[in-house]
Amino acid sequence: MIISAASDYRAAAQRILPPFLFHYIDGGAYAEYTLRRNVEDLSQVALRQRVLKNMSDLSLETTLFNEKLSMPVALAPVGLCGMYARRGEVQAAGAADAHGIPFTLSTVSVCPIEEVAPTIKRPMWFQLYVLRDRGFMRNALERAKAAGCSTLVFTVDMPTPGARYRDAHSGMSGPNAAMRRYWQAVTHPQWAWDVGLNGRPHDLGNISAYLGKPTGLEDYIGWLANNFDPSISWKDLEWIRDFWDGPMVIKGILDPEDARDAVRFGADGIVVSNHGGRQLDGVLSSARALPAIADAVKGDIAILADSGIRNGLDVVRMIALGADTVLLGRAYLYALATAGKAGVANLLNLIEKEMKVAMTLTGAKSISEISQDSLVQELDKALPAALAPLAKGNAA
C-alpha cells in the first residue's frame, strides 16, 4: 500500500487491526456527531495565501514549558497503545523522541512508566485521570516523577465514561465480546503474530504495577467503569499539587470560563479538547471552541488543542485559531498500527512537510507568526453559516 498522506494510515490500520481495536480508536460517543464535526470544522478553516515573502529561513521550532520542540506537536495520551503495535508505547515514544517532540504516556497504557521512560532521551509527559482510588493516583505521580517525567497532563473530561455505541457492535464490549475478539484476532494474522503473541504481556502496565497482579482487557473495561470519580472538582488540583511540582496541563477544556478557572487555580496549560468526540456527543468541536478560549486566556496560560487534527495543515489551522501546540492522537495510532515506530516517524515527517508548505504559502516564517492574520477573515462569506463564529473568534 502506498502511504503518501496521513489519511492513508487509517485505511492501512483498518486492514491490519481486528475490528474491536480499529473501531475502539476510530469511533466516538453516541451518534458520533462531534467526532465528525471535529474533522469537518477544522478542514473548512480557510487559510490566507500570501506570496513573494522570502520564506528561505522558515522555522517550525518552538518552546513549551522550557522544552524545545522541533515543531508545535506532541503525541497525545492514548489508552491501550500497546495493543496496536508490539510494545506500542515504547515504539511511539521512540519516534517522538527522535523527532524532537514530547510523548505522553496514558494512565491506562500497556507498557508501564518504568518500561518506557528509559528508552528515550527527552523527558516524557504523563497523563492522569481523577480516580476513586487516590492511592493509585499518588503512586502514579510518585512513579512518574521518579522516572523523570517532566509534565503532567491531568484529564478532567472523564468523570464517567462516554457511551460508545460502536464498541458494542465491534466486540470491545457487548454480548459474547470475548469470543468475538478471539475470532477477530485469529483472522487478522499480521496483528495476531506481531502483537497478540509477541507483544505480551497485555497488561495495564501502570495499574498492574500498583495492584501487584496481572491485568487484562476485561480488567480494563471493568476498571474504567468502576474507578472514574464523578466528584471531581477544582479542589483536586490542590491535592495533586502536593505531589507534583512540575508543569501541569488540564486536558478537556471547551468553555472560556473553565479556561479562566484553570488560570486561577495555577495550571500551567490547558488542552482545548472534547476527548476526540469520545465523551459527550453534541458539544462544540475543538476548532469551534478554541478562538473564544484564546480570547479569554491567551498569554496567561499555555494553550494546547486536540481533536480532529489529521495533517500538517490542521496543525497550522489550530495554531492560527489560538493554540500554542497541538496533540496528535488517532493520527499517530493509525500509523503505529500500520508500521510501528517507522510508521509514526514517517507520519511526523509528513506533518512537518505539510506544515512547511502551509507556512510558506501563508507567509509565516515562524510559529509565532501564525495567527488569525493567517486566516481568511471574511469566513462568513466563504464558508457555511455554521462556521461564521470562527472568523469572529466567538464560540457558537
From Swiss-Prot:
InterPro entries associated with the record: Aldolase_TIM, Alpha-hydoxy_acid_DH_FMN, FMN-dep_DH, FMN_HAD, FMN_hydac_DH_AS, LldD
Catalytic activity entry: (S)-lactate + A = pyruvate + AH2
Domain of life (superkingdom): Bacteria
Active-site residue list: H275
GO MF assignments: FMN binding; L-lactate dehydrogenase activity
Cofactors required: FMN
EC numbers: 1.1.-.-
UniProt family annotation: Belongs to the FMN-dependent alpha-hydroxy acid dehydrogenase family.
Protein name per Swiss-Prot or TrEMBL: L-lactate dehydrogenase
Gene name of this polypeptide: lldD
